[in-house]
């Protein structure tokens, strides 16, 4: 009996069994490494999307199409303008055509050139829609629009002066008003001049819009 008791009492207790018992009782182990904590940042960095600049670029494209349509209409109407009176003599035929007047020739050329410049500027206007913060394309558009506006306003003003003389004449210079005979010719000419001035208004709006957007872009890019 004593030998059995001594055998039971002398049974060694291993460290692994102690750890197992301590784990069973819910105690933490000193040798265990603490779990790592991962910190996730929920801060969202806003990406620039253009905002009102993209809307301004879309409006620029629409105004550009309006200017192209008006200038094409002005050049086409003036370029096809002529009138032949129903009466004639043995030696004379009363006929008037747009190319009889140098100012009307310049009118057709200037509006046609403005149309070409505006059509070539359409891809750059699309680039401004895709990239609202681009500065280079907007600067190029402002330069093209100023040049086209100068052509259109000069042509419309010169043609308007001739149309005024055709309607009213000049007593001081003894110029008669030919519109009393060539009514259809003068009416079509007046319509072409009005269309050209409408194109000039579109171009002025384009220049103002592009200048404001360009100023904001330069301020954002360079701090000017």
Swiss-Prot record:
For the region Disordered, give the residue spans.
1-30
Annotated signal sequence is none
What ranges does the Extracellular topological domain annotation cover?
79-105, 160-191
Compartment list: Cell membrane
Q: Which residues cross the membrane?
A: 58-78, 106-126, 139-159, 192-212
Positions on the Cytoplasmic side per record topology = 1-57, 127-138, 213-224
Q: Does the keyword Cell membrane apply?
A: yes
One GO term under biological process is: cell wall organization
Domain of life assignment: Eukaryota
What membrane topology does this protein have? Multi-pass membrane protein
Q: GO cellular component terms?
A: plasma membrane
Query: InterPro entries from the xrefs?
Result: CASP/CASPL, CASP_dom, CASPL
Entry keywords, A to Z = Cell membrane, Cell wall biogenesis/degradation, Glycoprotein, Membrane, Transmembrane, Transmembrane helix
Q: Which residues are glycosylated?
A: 168
| Functional summary from the UniProt entry | Regulates membrane-cell wall junctions and localized cell wall deposition. Required for establishment of the Casparian strip membrane domain (CSD) and the subsequent formation of Casparian strips, a cell wall modification of the root endodermis that determines an apoplastic barrier between the intraorganismal apoplasm and the extraorganismal apoplasm and prevents lateral diffusion.
Under the subunit heading, UniProt states: Homodimer and heterodimers.
The UniProt entry's sequence similarity note says: Belongs to the Casparian strip membrane proteins (CASP) family.
Name of this chain's protein: Casparian strip membrane protein 3
């Amino acid at each position: 009996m004593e030998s059995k008791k001594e055998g039971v009492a002398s049974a060694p207790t291993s460290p692994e069994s102690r750890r197992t018992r301590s784990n069973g009782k819910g105690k933490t182990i000193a040798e265990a490494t603490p779990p790592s904590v991962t910190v996730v940042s929920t801060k969202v960095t806003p990406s620039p999307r253009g905002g009102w600049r993209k809307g301004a670029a879309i409006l620029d494209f629409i105004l550009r199409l309006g200017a192209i349509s008006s200038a094409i209409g002005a050049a086409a109407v003036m370029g096809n303008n002529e009138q032949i009176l129903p009466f004639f003599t043995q030696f004379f035929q009363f006929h008037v055509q747009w190319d009889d007047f140098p100012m009307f020739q310049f009118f057709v050329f200037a509006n046609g050139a403005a149309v070409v410049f505006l059509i070539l500027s359409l891809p750059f206007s699309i680039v401004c829609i895709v990239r609202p913060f681009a500065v280079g394309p907007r600067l190029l558009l402002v330069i093209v629009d100023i040049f086209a506006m100068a052509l259109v306003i000069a042509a419309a003003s010169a043609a308007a002066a001739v149309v005024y003389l055709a309607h009213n004449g000049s007593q001081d210079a003894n110029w008669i008003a030919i519109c009393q005979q060539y009514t259809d010719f003068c009416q079509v000419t007046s319509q072409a001049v009005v269309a050209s001035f409408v194109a000039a208004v579109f171009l002025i709006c384009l220049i103002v819009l592009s200048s404001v957007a360009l100023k904001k872009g330069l301020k954002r890019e360079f701090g000017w």
